[in-house]
Amino acid sequence: MAQRFQLNSQTLPTADPLKRVSLIPRSAEQRLADNAGERRPLAPRSHEDNPFGGHTDDHHVAAPADHNKVMDHNSENLGSIVPKTAHYPHPSEEILDANIRHSMVPKSLGPNSLGGRFGPGKKQAFHRNGRPMFSLSDDRVMADRVLKTHSPDMIFFDVTSLLSVVNDIFKSHVPSIDSSAPKPSLVFKDYADHTSFETFADLIDQISCEIDCKCLHGGESHGMMTSGLHLDSRNTTTFSVLSLVSKYRWDAKLVLVLSALAVKYGVFLLLAETHATNQLTKSLALIKQLPSIFSRQNALHQRLDKTRILMQDMVDLTTTIIDIYQLPPNHITAAFTDHIPTAVYWIVRCVLICVSHISGASGFKQDQIMSFMEVSEIHENSERLRKINAYLLEQFKKSKMTIEEGIIEEEYQELIQTFTTIIHVDVVPPLLRLLRPIDFLYHGAGVSKRRVGINVLTQKHVLLLISDLENIEKELYILESLYTEAWQQSFEILWVPVQDFWTEADDAKFEALHMNMRWYVLGEPRKLRRAAIRFVREWWGFKNRPILVALDPKGQVMSTNAFPMVWIWQPFAHPFTTARERDLWSEQEWNLEFLIDGTDPHSLNQLVDGKYICLYGGEDMQWIKNFTSLWRNVAKAANIQLEMVYVGKRNPKNGIQPIINTIREENLSHTLPDLFQIWFFWTRVESMWESKQRMLKAHGIKGREGFKEEEKDLVLQEVVAMLGYGGEGDGWGLVSKASDMMVRAKGNLFSRGLAEFNEWEVNIPTKGFLTALNDHLLMRLPPHHCTRFMLPETAGIIPNEVECTECRRTMEKYYLYQCCLE
């Protein structure tokens, strides 16, 4: 019959909170303290009723739990043991059948707790397998006690290297006695650089002796005792070990204690590996009672495999703590320091558990596998360590992110200073700051490509071609055609690929792209710093479209995107300054020669010969056939020499390739050579619009003033009209001769005007062909029209108002998001 223990807290000496381990729930202990009455333990009737009757130390000990009985948590007689049929579960526990309490699955930890399977608000200890679990308040008290053992005196050593050696030992396995089993490949590491570990050999031996002497004498060798004495002994040993390493930093403490465990585990494995072939180790194994153990491979492997799980969790948590102490001191906050003592305590305690299992290997019976209690003990502690590690890792990642963001911000501000306020005498220093840690470039095409230093750009004008790897083919194609010897004498081009993330596929694409480039290419662009990427995105406006940043020989930024000037005027735009851009526009007239410059050499030659040139576009093949037929008839009737050129539309896709093929096959007219040239034609028109807007912005003209300024700018009006034509799929046409006026109209209107040639041909002798045609088209303008104008993607230059090219009224503004896949 089970006896009821009555407790008198006044007669017992005060015990340390961690030393005072009870099977009584903490909530019940609180009620006991508040009870005015007094309880005294009843004398046991016999030794069988109370096997600990003779024990009189100062520990608060409850009777060992009978597996057929469960704790009565609601009973007024606290601490009593009652039959399982009278079990009343505590509200915080799940209601489980008493017969399966020993197979209870571990509960998950709460989000704010680190000490065990208890979350916020769970004040009582859980009891599993007769083994009490500390509550959260216990952990706080325990952490305070751990802190009292901590008095570091700035002793530092290479904890990472020593932990690496320890981890190598932990990963070793007991060799199989089966000769047919495959042997693991041997990889020998060089530990020649680890001579500094000799300093700690004596301390590691001392820790090992402390664990062996106290742990084993306390009955822990087999890891089978579950009484309060067993746990209290392990707790005492934990603090004894912590006292030995009191003068070391937290991470160093752990590595030294784990080293002691590694020595014990390693010696055990050496005996297991060589006892059958080496007389000395065979004798040692005999003294240690190991030969029979080594013959029971299944049980031995099961025991050590379970132990290695806990070892790995200890190494993982220790690695995290080492990483934490690599942070700058001001970033090791309370989020770490409040929990690291707890982590240290449990790792040292888990070392004792592992020692128990390793030392206890010689004590288990023939073919006996690990008991449920032993497996559960490892599982519980692994769960605890992983919980702590997950929390510390999360805090560590947050701290690393904060540090990295601070570094990026500092480097970003430094780059702003470099390219705005600092005066340089050469272009190389600012380039080195922007591109570091990359310090070399590629130069030359194909097999002649070689590595050179950045200093080859000394005292040169440099164009930084900044792009990603996905949207640069067209720019590269056109730049290659423009990169003549005259260009190379004026400035150098340096390609800087910019991507937030790099993959192996990106590396391969980069290699393929830069192999055929004749200009300079940044080496290893994947190493470009995040601050540099942020700078070119935010300060220089790089988004999706490539940009061309112009630097003078002293590193001063001439233009954050010289592409519009390059597309419009090519090398004549040098040195790409705002002043140069203004001068070029002041000298430029709107004519067909300017419109097609650099895009269609054939048409330029025809202009030189005095022929009329008609540019047209659209996607309606029937209209194209009718339009070209009308023009042939008019040209023949008017006795003029006419060349027609199909220029497609803006953002050409593969969908217009069949149209180009039909035009060529049926010999309807000329076309631009390929899709790249069509893209370049319309990109030049977009660049004209962007350049004009940039001029207005540079002069501080905006709002209504900008609108009025645009009204005066005939070139800008014509550019807007062209962009309106190119953005639609409908047909349109434009005709001119050399430097004469240009006549333009939408497709149906133009076709109607050509069909009515008989009505206006009489005016040709007096007005001229182009003026007569233009006047007739103006008379045929429909009273109602719908004109659309899609702005090109530019660096944030969006005018508030745009004038309609047909009626000169202000156009309504809409937002268009478009995705066209072909």
UniProtKB/Swiss-Prot annotation:
Pfam families: SEO_C, SEO_N
Description of the deletion phenotype: No visible phenotype under normal growth conditions.
UniProt-annotated stretches for the region Disordered: 25-62
Tissue expression per record: Expressed in phloem sieve elements.
BP GO annotations: phloem development
GO molecular-function terms, A-Z: protein homodimerization activity
Domain of life of the native organism: Eukaryota
Biased composition (Basic and acidic residues): 28-62
Coiled-coil ranges (or none): none
InterPro entries for this protein: SEO_C (IPR027944), SEO_N (IPR027942), SEOA (IPR039299)
Biological function: Scaffold protein required to form the phloem filament matrix in sieve elements.
Subunit (UniProt): Can form homodimer.
PANTHER family to which the protein is assigned, alphabetical: PROTEIN SIEVE ELEMENT OCCLUSION A (PTHR33232:SF16), PROTEIN SIEVE ELEMENT OCCLUSION B-LIKE (PTHR33232)
The protein, known as: Protein SIEVE ELEMENT OCCLUSION A
